[in-house]
Amino acid sequence: MAKAKFERTKPHVNIGTIGHIDHGKTTLTAAITRVLHDKFPELNKASAFDQIDKAPEERQRGITISIAHVEYQTEARHYAHVDCPGHADYIKNMITGAAQMDGAILVVAATDGPMPQTKEHVILARQVGVPYIVVALNKADMVEDEELLELVEMEVRELLSSYEFPGDDVPVVRVSALKALEGDAEWGDKLMELMDAVDTAIPEPERAIDQPFLMPIEDVFTITGRGTVVTGRIERGVLNVNQEVEVVGIKPTSTKTTVTSIEMFNKMLDTGQAGDNAALLLRGLKRDDVERGQVVVKPGSITPHTEFEGQAYILSKDEGGRHTPFYNNYRPQFYFRTTDVTGVVSLPEGTEMVMPGDNTEMKVDLIQPIAMEEGLKFAIREGGRTVGAGRVVKILK
């Protein structure tokens, strides 16, 4: 059979399964691939459960995470789906954004209802900005009592509402991942119903190219007679020659300038877009006016800040992290995009210290401003060695 070619025509969405241990996240992931394979064989191959469960370890910024990646297609969309076998892997993945999610399938066993990790994953989803959730009420074949199913559904909705998800409107679909995986037609249909809910309740993400222009500066140099050139990889948006931009971060004030030329691989271009490695010639700026760590952006689209609340995972000793805990007023470097800035950490009330391998909330006060928005990722470093990773949850100043 000819290999199905990757069609660019379909919208692409990143999702993942979250929820308490043994509630059936991995079984559900395998069942989705099986049911979609049976329904659209030319679009999908089935993934075996044990392949997903024995997820290969990945190292992202020094953090070891087991993540299984599967892909599949519904009629409407192409999905990349992540599933993590261990609870610690989920926490690390969600905080560090190793695999970004546009939405999540929250798996809750109808036999148990919401459990501690269910709640923990929902809290994390809220904090790290997983924007949409669809609920799979799994093992529904094992609960005879309709009232009990309704009760569990109500509990899940209340849990979601208490963390600012629209609990009353979130789709809750009763499924049996195991039965569907075994090929039971009726439960297979319920799984299709779940995927229809995912298709409709998780909106298509805004593509990087449609967002406001942003390029982190990696390098700065002068071309005699022409001016100052900055290089970097365009993170989002589109830039045209002669467009006005703003240089933001590190320095106390932002600077507006015009891009008079865009080059890629030594060729002059009219435009640059998300994903391009580009060199931009900036009008009227001296070599000392710009530096690595700043960003070139669409004017007014992002602002510099020094204080934020973050959620971070601190590497364990085995991952090459610290061997000892840290305390209030810890002063590491925070690495944003292309540069390190020193920051002072304040721990939440009641937290005396943070151990290697923990995840924690923290308030950070940076000594220089960084172009920042909620969701921005950072690494925590000591002398160039990564000891943690996290993201901005809320900007304070």
UniProtKB/Swiss-Prot annotation:
UniProt-listed Gene3D superfamilies: P-loop containing nucleotide triphosphate hydrolases (3.40.50.300), Translation factors (2.40.30.10)
InterPro entries: EF-Tu_GTP-bd (IPR041709), EF-Tu_GTPase (IPR050055), EFTu-like_2 (IPR004161), EFTU_2 (IPR033720), G_TR_CS (IPR031157), P-loop_NTPase (IPR027417), Small_GTP-bd (IPR005225), T_Tr_GTP-bd_dom (IPR000795)
Domain tr-type G stretches: 10-206
Region entry G3, spans: 83-86
GO annotations of cellular component type: cytosol
Subcellular location: Cytoplasm
Binding of GTP, residues: 19-26, 83-87, 138-141
SUPFAM superfamilies from the UniProt entry: EF-Tu/eEF-1alpha/eIF2-gamma C-terminal domain, P-loop containing nucleoside triphosphate hydrolases, Translation proteins
Key word Ribosomal protein present: no
Keywords for the protein's UniProt record, in alphabetical order: Cytoplasm, Elongation factor, GTP-binding, Hydrolase, Magnesium, Metal-binding, Nucleotide-binding, Protein biosynthesis
Molecular function as annotated in GO: GTP binding; GTPase activity; translation elongation factor activity
UniProt region (G1), positions on chain: 19-26
Residues covered by region (G2): 62-66
This protein's name: Elongation factor Tu
Source species taxonomy: Bacteria, Bacillati, Actinomycetota, Actinomycetes, Kineosporiales
